[in-house]
Amino acid sequence: ACKDGFPTATCQHAKLVGNCKNSQKYRANCAKTCGPC
């Protein structure tokens, strides 16, 4: 059930700049890239 709602590049950038930790929006929409799936 883990998938990225945003494009992969967007999610990888979000991970790089720390948005996975800081932004609920990115956690939700980049679950595959950000999260422990």
UniProtKB/Swiss-Prot annotation:
Identify the PROSITE patterns for this entry.
Answer: SHKT
Q: Which GO terms describe its cellular component?
A: extracellular region; nematocyst
Region of interest (Crucial for binding to potassium channels), ranges: 25-26
- A GO BP annotation: envenomation resulting in negative regulation of voltage-gated potassium channel activity in another organism
What keywords is this UniProt entry annotated with? Disulfide bond, Ion channel impairing toxin, Nematocyst, Neurotoxin, Potassium channel impairing toxin, Secreted, Toxin, Voltage-gated potassium channel impairing toxin
Cellular location of this protein? Secreted; Nematocyst
Which InterPro entries does UniProt cross-reference here? ShKT_dom
Which GO molecular function terms does the record list?
potassium channel inhibitor activity; toxin activity
The miscellaneous remark of the record is: No cytolytic activity on erythrocytes detected. Not active on rat KCNA4/Kv1.4 or KCNA5/Kv1.5 channels.
Q: What does this protein do?
A: Inhibits voltage-gated potassium channels (IC(50)=14.42 nM for rKCNA1/Kv1.1, IC(50)=80.4 nM for rKCNA2/Kv1.2, IC(50)=7.76 nM for rKCNA6/Kv1.6, IC(50)=13.12 nM for hKCNA3/Kv1.3, and IC(50)=49.14 nM for insect Shaker IR). Binds the Shaker IR channels in a voltage-independent manner.
Q: Which family does it belong to?
A: Belongs to the sea anemone type 1 potassium channel toxin family. Type 1b subfamily.
Q: What is this protein called?
A: Kappa-actitoxin-Bcs3b
